[in-house]
Regions:
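A hydrophobic alpha-helical transmembrane-helix feature that marks the membrane cores
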Residues: 1-223
Length: 223
């Protein structure tokens, strides 16, 4: 979302956005809806994670918001250049990642231990901290040039994208372990919903990161 906001030209009621080298016209109403969807996604995500009683509803609503955002990227951004097939490519890669991690977990090749959870949690906190630094830094005049330079560095964008995908893939192992724990211990329904949402959240996260990486590569040199 920040990348969409960082480079635009307002022309009446229309905004020409630049997303990873893809220039796409966006009407102000669409921009407002998109921003609203992103904000709603954050709210629903937090409620689903921390207010377990609301997970059946907020989890579903979160998935809807992500579906809207994915549709925007595939049909609005890529569709403007007849590259919708890249969305299908991202889906196939995501399915391959999920199947691979499922196999690694089922075969016991990767086991969920306290050390594994600690490493994953540390990586997740690092990712969140880096994202917050990037977002906040963009609005600070002193750090904005550095943030913009980092975001427009192709090699850095690709490397960070791959790292994020690896971290998200490892989170799948934790999700599988959580589901096993809930089922084997016959925990209450609310835990089943939370486990299901956790898995859905991770899969959507992987897809968006894979799609963003593909868009970054496809859009390289279009600026």
């Amino acid at each position: 979302m920040q990348r969409i906001a960082e480079s635009y030209l307002s022309t009446g009621s229309r905004i020409d956005i630049n997303y990873e080298g893809f220039k796409v016209p966006l009407y102000s109403t669409e921009a407002i809806v998109l921003i609203g969807v992103v904000i709603a996604a954050i709210v629903f995500q937090l409620l689903a994670f921390f207010a377990s009683a609301t997970t059946p509803v907020t989890g579903a609503l979160y998935s809807v918001t992500q579906g809207y955002f994915i549709s925007f990227l595939v049909f609005k951004v890529l569709g403007a250049y007849d590259l919708e097939y890249l969305g299908a490519m991202a889906l196939m890669i995501t399915v391959l990642i999920v199947l691979t991690m499922s196999l690694l977990y089922a075969k016991g090749i990767i086991r969920v231990t306290k050390k594994f959870k600690m490493v994953i949690t540390t990586l997740f906190i690092t990712v969140i901290a880096a994202s917050l630094f990037s977002f906040i830094g963009y609005f600070i005049p002193f750090t904005r040039p550095m943030i913009v330079a980092m975001q427009h560095n192709f090699a850095l964008s690709v490397i960070s994208g791959v790292i994020f995908i690896i971290i998200a893939a490892l989170f799948l192992i934790c999700d599988f372990d959580t589901i096993d724990h809930v089922v084997n211990n016959k925990l209450p329904k609310k835990y089943e919903w939370q486990a299901a949402f956790g898995l859905a959240f991770t899969v959507l996260w992987i897809y968006l990161k894979v799609l963003d990486l593909i868009i970054t590569i496809a859009g390289h040199g279009r600026d």
